[in-house]
Every structure is written in structure tokens, then in C-alpha cells.
Amino acid sequence: WYIGIILVNLIGLYMSMSMSSCMTLFLTMLIYLMIKGKKKSATALFLFIAIIAFALLSGQIFPRIDTTTDIFRTRIDVWSTALKGIADHALFGMGPSAYQLVWPAYSGYPTFHAHNLFLDTLLNFGVVGGCAIFFYVLTQLKLLMKRFQVNVCKNRNILVLVMFAAVLIHGCTDVTIFWIQTGMLFLLVYTSTGIQNNVKSFAQRKHNMSIH
């Protein structure tokens, strides 16, 4: 089943012609293998990625590679427009989906969002909201690290960490996490951190058991 699901996902990625999604997939797979300590598999995957990247540069497997320059130029235009909006509303931002209000005002490229998770967050919620989100995420990451230390649901923790890495990597060129489907999927996986979430008391009980 897992192999079938992976193949379906790979076919979907190829049909979408999304280079950033493919890059995110390969990088998160590398991160997963490294965390699991599978260095040989990680090395093999790295070599496979290098071969695929070389093949993609020919434009035969991935025709969209020929339009990379135009796509990157469009991204630069979108990011520049977002930065102008951030500069004018730095403190509290302009609310959700703010880019749709910004691009007409600054004659920017017309699209739905800033195509960058970090810029879009600042544009929507400003420095105040961005800092609040940052510190909340930091707190959750600390909890996740503690769960690793006391070996609480390790496989689930790895899944959460890899998905978080995918959000950050793909967030460099898109804001897919804000979509309903992907956002709900991430939250569903993230709820696994609620299993035995009192890490300190769990660690203390484990310590007491080792003493006795």
C-alpha cells in the first residue's frame, strides 16, 4: 500500500509540474532518512536526486524547466510587491489574504498570495502577529525535542518534524499550508503531540522507576 501511495503521489507531482514540490519531497525524504539513521539510504537518495536534477536540466523530463527564468522573474515581482505592503503595514499587517489587496495598489503581479510563507505571514499579520506565531511554533518545537529525549512516540514525532520541514521548505515559494486540505492534514498529524503531552511528568516517572 505504501509503495502504491508513493507512486500515486509521484505521478501527481509530475502532472502538476511543480518543481518546488518535487524539491520539497526529495529534501524531506533526505531529512527523514537522516533522522532514522539510514545513512546508506540517504546517500543513495542523494545520488538519485543528483541524476534526476541533471536529467531535468535537459528539459526533456520536466518541460517546465524551460520556463524557470520567467517563473523566477514572476516570483521576484510578487515578493517585491509583498515587501512594499509589509513596509507600509509593518506592525499589524493587513489581515488574511492581504496580497489580493496589495497587488492592485502597487501595480504588482496579480495572484492570490505572496508565494512565500514568511512574507505572506508578515503581510497578513505584521511583525506583532508574526512574532506571536514564531514564539508559539518555537514552544511546540521545544516540546517536540523533549518528546524525542524521553522517547515518547518517536515515530510520530519524526512524522511531525518531517512535515514541519516540508512546510518550511515549500514555504520558500508557496503558502500551501494555508489551504484547507493541507492545513487540516498538518493539524491532524500535529495532534499526535498531544499523546502523553505531559513530558516533564513522564520523564520524572521514568526517572523514579529507574531509581527503584
Please give the residue ranges for each predicted region.
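Long extracytoplasmic/lumenal interhelical loops at the membrane interface
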Residues: F62, D66-S80, K84-F125
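Helix-loop-helix junctions and helix-breaking kinks within/between transmembrane helices
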Residues: Y2-L33, F62, F125-V127, V175-I177
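A membrane-periplasm/extracellular boundary helix in multi-pass inner-membrane enzymes
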Residues: S16, Y32-F72, S80-D88, P96
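Structural signal for the C-terminal ends of transmembrane alpha-helices
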Residues: L30-K38, A55-S58, L141-Q149, T191-V199
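Transmembrane alpha-helices of multi-pass inner-membrane enzymes
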Residues: L159-H212
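Hydrophobic transmembrane alpha-helices and their immediate junctions
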Residues: M29, T43, V127-L168
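Hydrophobic transmembrane alpha-helices of multi-pass, membrane-embedded glycosylation machinery
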Residues: I6-L7, C22-M34, F46-I51, L138-Q140, ...
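A conserved mid-to-late transmembrane alpha helix and its immediate loop/hinge
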Residues: L10, M15, S21, S80, ...
